[in-house]
């Protein structure tokens, strides 16, 4: 029989949280499974809850100019949201900006990995400041846990369909303005994704439905896609006799 060559990889998962929320737990399960398979997997997160050495809380540089940079960016994002959410109807899911207070600073923490896997990264990874440069350095996989990567801010479009052309006049903002916050976010994402070589970013979805959404979207349509259902630890979840 032929010997099987197993190559271990050094992998970084980027996630807004490690275990708080369903998307974070899915990311953490993948990270844990990869480690059990012999890979050198790490998580870099905006909020750490688990007591695990391979999960790293991101704090960012603490210099005076860096703190001012984050404060200024945080204030601008909050001001734009405050102005744009005045007429927002009740009952919708989260709506998040493509920017984060960290901006480009996050790139300083991402070195010497074979591959980077993004997960639910809202309010943590600044897409325009991070993704184009990151994808030029290292292969990137983005595992989508909802629709946010392809929209102007919503995490589920509730049948709106604007993500297939261009966001604006957003129902989830209660907006009738074409150049509203959803259009601004959509256009910034379009510039960021436009600066990325299609071969440097792979989109992974846990369902065929979400994969079809990505394929039909203006923002993600050019990138290769794979459907990989969520994994479970079969030591915990396995058929048993009743």
Identify what each model region corresponds to.
Residues 9-242:
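Catalytic cores of nucleotide-sugar-dependent glycosyltransferases that transfer UDP/GDP/TDP-activated
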